[in-house]
A protein has these predicted regions:
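Residue-level recognition of hydrophobic positions within alpha-helical transmembrane segments
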Residues: 17, 57-58
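Short, Lys/Arg-enriched charge-dense amphipathic segments
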Residues: 12-14, 67-70
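Polyanion-binding surface elements
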Residues: 5-32
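Major-groove DNA-recognition helix of helix-turn-helix-type DNA-binding domains
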Residues: 24-54, 61, 67-68
């Protein structure tokens, strides 16, 4: 399938989000998301694909629900 005919998966159905997607979805800046990833290296909600950071959506939501300050 070409990109024009592919059906886009809604963000709320994706397993993981890249930094720009997560920033838009959660309303948190990209810089802060990268800091969170660096501060929580090895956390269950972080997925590293090569040098790229992805956030496991449901697990990151659980993390946010338990956090008082970002």
């Amino acid at each position: 399938m070409s990109k024009n005919t592919e059906k886009a998966i809604p963000v709320w159905e994706k397993y993981s989000l890249n930094v720009p997607e997560a920033a838009e979805y959660y309303g948190i800046g990209e810089k802060r998301l990268r800091q969170i990833a660096n501060e929580n290296e090895g956390a269950d909600f972080i997925l590293k694909v090569g040098s790229h950071i992805r956030f496991k959506r449901k697990m990151f939501e659980d993390y946010l629900n338990e956090t008082n300050t970002i």
